[in-house]
């Protein structure tokens, strides 16, 4: 196997493994990350409405892009026909969750709030 082919293969692998986070206008990723520790209700009062209102940006994103934007989900569920759900805790009391449903190929198809 030639050296050029090896480098080309490595380059393709690196480029395919990068997933940029979707750009949601007004979304502050630092506040999202710190909110459950500080209990300021940023997730429930500001971030979740932004994500719901700009759902066209979120829908169609793959699981890795959502994780790049929101971090690891609080809970995950695998449903029938390989559909997957990510659940994100929105407040310190854990009474409100953001649910993102992915289809079998891993694209976000639904985003909603669950009380």
Where are these regions (language model features)?
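Residues within mature, well-folded domains
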Residues: 19-115
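C-terminal motif of bacterial Sec signal peptides marking the signal peptidase cleavage site
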Residues: 14-17
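N-terminal hydrophobic targeting signals that begin at the initiator methionine
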Residues: 1-2, 19
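Sec-dependent signal peptide recognition
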Residues: 3-10
